[in-house]
Design a protein with these regions (language model features):
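Alpha/beta catalytic cores of group-transfer enzymes, especially the acyltransferase/condensing modules
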Residues: 13-15, 40-42, 104-255
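Non-catalytic positions within long, well-ordered alpha-helices that form the structural scaffold/packing
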Residues: 80, 186, 264-270
């Protein structure tokens, strides 16, 4: 039964860890089955990688992406198998948008895993090690961050890449430009701005060529109309039609993730409950920060999963 007040969100890179979903897999066979299906598309044993590592490989973006896609769909299918309420809307953060579209039936898990492994490889190739950087900026107004990025982009590019919640923005671009932006932010009194352990500046213009090649690869995917609307990152809108959905996915790679807007769009559409489909609790935490009235819960452990099943049964 579809519940208008319920929306599900799928996390992106940063939520992976060795041993993720091990407990849920013991209780729900479909978790491991989902990883096995995704492995067919990715061409690598994703369950073994997620459980045993090596961690260095799991954290390489071309492997992180299919592993997290598998994890998101594993939790989604476990929820379906357990008879959980059907959400009225879906969204995913960056890579998580692909999981949302797989969950909605827009593409198969196997196709999705193949596509996001390629996406990761293209992203790595677009910014050789040491050329790109990203940093989290906390407690600063959007307008200030945007102004500083413009000032720091005199030689090289730095732009806002993720609008994660009010007062939490990730910037990205050429490494030297990111360093200049951090220095300027410090001069403007911003005390919490830290570089991230990420070398690929996703959601910045440096990914434009990768996006073009990703667009070409999308022609090899069998697309369907989503059975559940998906709010997409580029503009926090639901797009109608396969071509419009594809275009939004391509643009997502070089434009900022409007995550604050996505969560606000879910709430405006009537969502009061948000379930995080995947490992970790990043998105449920952001959702509560964006809208304190939301009942946002993680679903990635047996305890959290069962608690949400019980709380959202009616």
């Amino acid at each position: 039964m579809t519940v208008p007040q319920l929306a599900f969100v799928f996390p992106g890179q940063g939520s992976q860890s060795i041993g993720m979903l091990a407990g849920l897999a013991e209780a729900h066979a479909v978790v491991r089955e989902s990883f096995e299906e995704a492995s067919q598309g990715a061409g690598v044993d994703l369950w073994a990688l997620a459980q045993q590592g090596p961690e260095e490989q799991l954290n390489q973006t071309e492997f992180t992406q299919p592993a997290l896609l598998a994890a998101g769909i594993a939790v989604w299918r476990a929820w379906q198998a357990a008879g959980g309420a059907q959400p009225a809307l879906l969204a995913g953060h960056s890579l998580g948008e692909y999981a949302a579209l797989v969950a909605a039936g827009a593409m198969s898990l196997e196709d999705g895993a193949r596509l996001v492994r390629l996406r990761g490889r293209l992203m790595q190739d677009a910014a050789p090690a040491g050329t790109g950087a990203m940093a989290a900026v906390l407690g600063a107004e959007d307008a200030l961050v945007e102004e500083v990025c413009r000032e720091a982009s005199q030689d090289g590019i730095v732009v806002p890449a993720n609008h994660n919640s009010p007062g939490q923005i990730v910037i990205g671009g050429h490494a030297a430009a990111v360093e200049r932006a951090l220095a300027l932010l410090g001069e403007r009194g911003v005390r919490k701005a830290v570089k991230l352990a990420v070398s690929v500046p996703s959601h910045t213009p440096l990914m434009r060529e990768a996006a073009n090649r990703l667009d070409e690869a999308m022609a090899n995917v069998a697309w369907n109309e989503p059975a559940i609307p998906v709010v997409q990152n580029v503009d926090a809108q639901v797009h109608e039609g396969v071509q419009a959905i594809r275009d939004a996915l391509v643009r997502q790679l070089y434009l900022p993730v409007q995550w604050t807007g996505c969560v606000q769009a879910l709430a405006t559409a009537g969502a009061t409950r948000i379930g995080e489909c995947g490992p970790g609790k990043v998105l449920s935490g952001l959702a509560r920060r964006i809208d304190k009235g939301l009942d946002a819960r993680a679903l990635g452990t047996p305890g959290d999963f069962e608690a949400a099943l019980g709380a959202w049964a009616g």
